[in-house]
Design a protein with these regions (language model features):
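Short, Lys/Arg-enriched N-terminal segments with co-localized hydrophobic residues
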Residues: 1-14
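Acidic/histidine-enriched, beta-strand-rich ligand/metal-binding domains
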Residues: 13-95
C-alpha cells in the first residue's frame, strides 16, 4: 500500500511539473522549483523568459529548442537551468 501511495504522489507531482500551455509559437510553463515560477519559450525567436519567485524576469537569447525540451524534462529543472541555460546564453533583465 505504501508503494502505491508513493507512486501516486510522484505521478501527481510530475503532472504538475509538466503543465504547459501553447499560444502560437510560445510555450508557457509553470515550474516547481525553489527559485523559478514559470517559463515562456518562443520557438521562432529561440528566446526563453524565466520568472523567479522574487518577481524578477529575465530573457535568454538563442536557446535551442532541444535545450528547452531537456530543461522541461529534467528531474531538477532548477539545477538544469543553472548549469545549462543561465550560465550559457546571453540574457537581459526585463522586469
Amino acid at each position: 500500500m505504501d508503494f502505491f501511495l508513493y507512486v501516486f504522489i510522484l505521478k501527481e507531482k510530475t503532472m504538475a511539473i509538466t503543465k504547459e500551455e501553447i499560444q502560437g509559437t510560445k510555450i508557457l510553463n509553470e515550474v516547481e522549483s525553489s527559485n523559478l515560477v514559470r517559463t515562456e519559450y518562443d520557438t521562432e525567436t529561440k528566446k526563453m523568459i524565466a520568472e523567479f519567485k522574487n518577481g524578477m524576469r529575465y530573457e535568454y537569447e538563442g536557446v535551442p529548442h532541444q535545450t528547452y525540451t531537456s530543461f522541461r524534462s529534467a528531474q531538477s529543472q532548477g539545477n538544469f537551468f543553472n548549469k545549462n541555460i543561465s550560465k550559457t546564453f546571453p540574457y537581459k533583465k526585463i522586469s
